[in-house]
Amino acid sequence: MTTKAIYPGTFDPLTNGHLDLLTRASRLFDHVVLAIAASPSKQTLFTLDERVALAKGATEHLSNVDVIGFSDLMAHFAQQQNANILVRGLRAVADFEYELQLAKMNHHLMPTLESVFLMPSEEWSFISSSLVKEVARHGGDVSHFLPDAIVSALMEKLR
């Protein structure tokens, strides 16, 4: 049986922490879709098309990963993709309550959809896209936290 997993998020922008989880998921599952959410309720710095393009560039070395933008409910997107696994990262205990609610709702909407939680590597456990953007906005060096092409795109966007 082929396993297909979806790793969803806004990824505004994709960080090395996200990339670490994605790389690890790509070793666990036959195929992984990095599903980039339109997230109209969030004020994203990058458009959906920009986030998809940046993520495609950062993941081209992962042969079993596809990057796809979506604006549907996650459960509906998973059905469209014939996937039955959601990969989510848990950085801290604070993430758990929200992730548990999401997992329960997604399972209610699609009973065959299972959520699998991965812990970030210690190096990336404190990183979030929001934090990286905030540091960059104030002139801090974020090159350790983002793939090179995304660092350039972020600096350009913040000019």
UniProtKB/Swiss-Prot annotation:
Pathway: Cofactor biosynthesis; coenzyme A biosynthesis; CoA from (R)-pantothenate: step 4/5. Disulfide bonds: none annotated. It is found in: Cytoplasm. This is Phosphopantetheine adenylyltransferase. It comes from the Bacteria. The gene is coaD. Its cofactor is Mg(2+). Transmembrane segments: none annotated. One of its GO terms (cellular component) is cytoplasm. Substrate binds at residues 10, 42, 74, 88. It catalyses: (R)-4'-phosphopantetheine + ATP + H(+) = 3'-dephospho-CoA + diphosphate. HAMAP family: PPAT_bact.
